[in-house]
Structure formats: C-alpha cells, structure tokens
Amino acid sequence: MSPLVSPLGRRNAGLAMLALALPRPAGAQAQDSGTILVPGPEDGGCARWAARAAAVLTRGLQRPANLRLSVLGGPDGVTAANRFATQEGGNDARFLVLPGWTCHVRLTGATRARFEPRGWLPLMLTWHGALLAGRGALPTRPLVPLRIAIPSPDAPEAAALAALDLLGITAQPVIGVPEAAFAAGEADALIVTGPDPAARARAMGAVPWYLLSTPAEGQLSEIPPFPVTSPAHRGVLAAVAGLQMRAALVMPALTPADTVAIWRRAAMRWPDEERAHPDLGLALIGTGAAGAFAILSPPPEATLAYRSWLDQRLGWRAG
C-alpha cells in the first residue's frame, strides 16, 4: 500500500468517481436541458429568433446545455401555443416562442386559440415601439372623417380606428395595407411600429400623435402617451402590442422557482448580445419583459371591451 494514500482516502476517491459515473438527479438535468416549441416554418422568422435565443441561453448557463427546437404549426403561433398549454410537465425545462400576433388572435376571441397566456413566465422578448400618426397635426374636429386603412377587422392594425374612437375623433375604416394606403393618399392615419417609430413615421411624411406604449416610456418622449382611463383603452393597447412584440420566450406558469431562476440568469446576456442587431427591436428581460408581456394579456374586462368594439363598430365576431 502506498504511504501517500490511506485506505480511507482510497475509499473516498472511489466514491467520488462512482458519483461522477452515476446519472444526475432529474432536477439537475432539467437545469441544463430543455425543449423550445417554435411556430413554423422551420426556416421562418420564429425559428431564426429561437435559434438566437437558444444560443444566448446556452452561453449564459456557462456550462454544456442541450436545448432542442421543436417546430410545430404555422407562423401565427396558435397551434404551438395550444400544444404548449396542454403539455404535461417533465424533467426537462419547457419553453415556447410566442409572437405577439398569437396573443392578438386570442384577444379577438377566435375559438381556435385555446390557451391562456396570462400566467406564462416571459424570460426574454423583442419589442418594437408604436405610435399613432397621421397626416399633419391631430385634428380635434375633422371636417370629414379620417380614413383608417386596415387589412381586416381582426388585424391588430384595426386598433388605430379604435384609438381614434376613444379620442372622440371621427374616422372611418377603409380596406387596405396601412402604410401602402397612406403613401398613396388613401388613408389619413395609421399605427407605426419599429425600433424607432417616430423616425419611421416622419420618413413616410406622417406626424406622430400619440405614443402607444406604457406611460413610463411616454414620459421620456416628446410624444404624449395615449391616455389609459378605461378597460377599453387597455384593450386597444393590447391589440397594438400584437404588432409590438416580435417574439417572446416563455415558460409554463407552474415551472419550479429554482428552474426559472436558473434560466433567468442565463437570459441576462440577451440585451447585450442583441445590441448587435438594433434593427430587430428592443431586447427585454426581467421586469421589462414582464411589463411588456402583461400588455398583451389585459384584464378580462379590457378583452371584452375590445371584442365588443369589433362587433359593434366593424360588425365582426370571431368564430
């Protein structure tokens, strides 16, 4: 026996080697592996966004990780969200890439949207600013109704008409793509979104009227924030947010707190790494992501107010 290794030391060393060889507990495996459910197609925008998000999380863990992308359904995200809402819990962490449009489908009352996003936990998301803009200064009493181009009643762009109704400004809908109709002189006002919506509005010859975002952000801008004084106003902002949230990575509501904490720490790199892509929008995590995500899931009375407006104003009811 070597004088440098006692029997007790050899026993401890053997136990340590055995521990390394044994499978780790399920909880430990869940900390560095998971499945990200992604709306299709495989080469679509959501899949590319998911690949960037997965790479950031892997680097943020600072240890080998196994994040798998599972593509399901079409780009509106409803099929993927429905599946995510009904999946059973497992050892691996579960994530969903959720576009803003998916939440808007639910806001309008479409029966095919059978998910409830209110309790989901956003880790990271990409967000665009939004504002209501028009031709010239905001008219308080236009001589003729302002024309608002909307692709369809259930499109989030219809929120421009709803906003003007709440402001007491006479307006009427016209069918069309908002920016194209505005450029052709066939529309007088529209919602403008993007990383810098004010600059984009001015580039197309529009004057920013109201910032369609949170009051806190409005205080930092020369553009007044859209007043929020009723559930109907919150419903309008929820519709606009369907355009603003490009994508979010969310976890189920009942995810264990320690698992959420691990992945939230990993997501802290997201804003810094996304600065290389300023044209894609604002990268949000933490309370910023939670606040933005909450806009898309307003209280029930706000949701009902927007659906009622769609029915009474545009004669549209989801089926």
Regions found by a protein language model. Give the residues of each.
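N-terminal export signals
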Residues: 3-4, 11-28
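Short boundary motifs at domain starts and secondary-structure transition points
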Residues: 22-29, 136-141, 239-240
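N-terminal (or domain-start) structured segment
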Residues: 28-119, 152-156, 165-196, 200, ...
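Hinge/capping helix and adjacent helix->loop/strand transition within the periplasmic-binding protein
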Residues: 61, 86-92, 108-181, 246-277
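Short, hydrophobic beta-strand segments that form beta-sheet elements in well-ordered domains
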Residues: 149-151, 190, 209-212
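C-terminal lobe and pocket-closing loops
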Residues: 200-266
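An extracytoplasmic/periplasmic, membrane-proximal ligand-sensing/linker region
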Residues: 261-319
